[in-house]
Amino acid sequence: MLKPSVTSAPTADMATLTVVQPLTLDRDVARAIELLEKLQESGEVPVHKLQSLKKVLQSEFCTAIREVYQYMHETITVNGCPEFRARATAKATVAAFAASEGHSHPRVVELPKTDEGLGFNVMGGKEQNSPIYISRIIPGGVAERHGGLKRGDQLLSVNGVSVEGEHHEKAVELLKAAKDSVKLVVRYTPKVLEEMEARFEKLRTARRRQQQQLLIQQQQQQQQQQTQQNHMS
């Protein structure tokens, strides 16, 4: 659990302090499940309703919401009262999940930053009309040993900075600039990556054909020039 951090927000008269309280979401959910179990034992509430609510609280989706919310709360830059920060965090969390509609839910992955790098490659970007994706997990690298990332994960943010709609170089710079560790928000969309790679392969094939045609034309021109020189001599 992160320790509370204190940031100052100067005003015209005096500096006011905003204390960012640490979240206790894991403990809160565990306590809620404990209370549900006690209610179930008492028989005051229909068992099937309590079991349904308990199942929701223990689901992967609820865990993902909790992780993303806590990540947003820790990284979002907001000055103001705790209520204002909570509203801003909630909006950022909803936006992350709304962007994932039709795909896997967002996940938070934290990797240590070492001299050997992070152990994955990215492709795509605004200049290619494509999201930024994890295109390769390097065998034996940090990402593979950690096990949190997958080939086909779309990169949503790096250390709290969104890379959706950004150029490829922006994501690379953020990854390189990270110190000690890097927190990523990703979502798994392998089909989109496959479509993107297929599109890139078509472009590469078309480029190779153009180069071959250009080479043939150059050879033909050289042959014509050589033929003309032979006739002149």
Swiss-Prot record:
Its main location: membrane. The keyword Membrane applies. Expressed in brain, testis, kidney, placenta and liver. Residues 25-80 form the L27 domain. SUPFAM superfamilies: L27 domain, PDZ domain-like. Keywords: Cell junction, Cell membrane, Exocytosis, Membrane, Postsynaptic cell membrane, Protein transport, Synapse, Tight junction, Transport. A motif (Kinase interacting site) lies at residues 14-28. InterPro entries: L27_C, L27_dom, L27_dom_sf, LIN7, MAM_complex_regulator, PDZ, PDZ_sf. Residues 108-190 form the PDZ domain. It is a peripheral membrane protein. Disulfide bonds: none annotated. PROSITE patterns: L27, PDZ. One of its GO terms (biological process) is protein transport. GO terms for molecular function: L27 domain binding; protein-macromolecule adaptor activity. It comes from the Eukaryota. Transmembrane segments: none annotated. It is found in: Cell membrane; Basolateral cell membrane; Cell junction; Postsynaptic density membrane. GO terms for cellular component: basolateral plasma membrane; bicellular tight junction; cell-cell junction; extracellular exosome; MPP7-DLG1-LIN7 complex; plasma membrane; postsynaptic density membrane; presynapse. Forms a complex with CASK and CASKIN1. Component of the brain-specific heterotrimeric complex (LIN-10-LIN-2-LIN-7 complex) composed of at least APBA1, CASK, and LIN7, which associates with the motor protein KIF17 to transport vesicles along microtubules. Can also interact with other modular proteins containing protein-protein interaction domains like PALS1, PALS2, MPP7, DLG1, DLG2 and DLG3 through its L27 domain. Interacts with DLG4, GRIN2B and MARCHF11 as well as CDH1 and CTNNB1, the channels KCNJ12/Kir2.2, KCNJ4/Kir2.3 and probably KCNJ2/Kir2.1 and SLC6A12/BGT-1 via its PDZ domain. Plays a role in establishing and maintaining the asymmetric distribution of channels and receptors at the plasma membrane of polarized cells. Forms membrane-associated multiprotein complexes that may regulate delivery and recycling of proteins to the correct membrane domains. The tripartite complex composed of LIN7 (LIN7A, LIN7B or LIN7C), CASK and APBA1 associates with the motor protein KIF17 to transport vesicles containing N-methyl-D-aspartate (NMDA) receptor subunit NR2B along microtubules. The kinase interacting site is required for proper delivery of ERBB2 to the basolateral membrane. Belongs to the lin-7 family. This is Protein lin-7 homolog A.
